[in-house]
């Protein structure tokens, strides 16, 4: 399959399913062809916070190239699937794989590989640790410490927000408020509204969190209405005739000076949103301190959010939830 000049997403997944030895097995990853093109027995792939945070910061590509040198191939972002597999195949046509330890896909993640599973895993840990250590050396946590007052929890306003969010979604939803150090610090940030609307750690997250968060003022329902309008505009700008707009409910948002709010239609989906946001908020703050948070533009985010393969993945987890 990797030798083909072109292959549609639907055709690709059909061919991958035809190759299954067990027809009841889970559908292979959209990156299965890419994994197969890497000439090693074992491949590890993560959306490591440290590497993607560097990638999403000002001058991130240059920083990663300096950090990893010739050990790691740095490639520009390309939408996952067949096109990405072709990009990697072309970029590595003359590569000596014995000298390469990993591949960074900017704004996406890190691949490591080896003939031995432990060697591939250890390479992942070592490269991620190197990125984490680099960030620790560049960002002075003590310089930003301050006393942030915790405002009283307005239970009535929060209950009204959850109720109105359910009306937007079309059925009752769950909501939670995080007032941890990172979330409260973010909520007190002077540019919190701009940052929460800027974009995610990696575009894969958009199917769970949407491409941007909401901004909730003291009376949060007004922020919910603003998000619905903004998301409608986002869809109108990027949609094609075959697209149908998803629900307008935000999956998270910053409640100014109070914390981070998360929404979902079920407990399982809420836990997913909470987990993603718990990684996203510190990454954005770190990216800002590294020179500025620079995620992918909304055109790329829309392509993933409304990609038929990602929507199929979301539908499969929704039925399980």
Identify what each model region corresponds to:
Residues 1-321:
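Glycine-rich flexible loops
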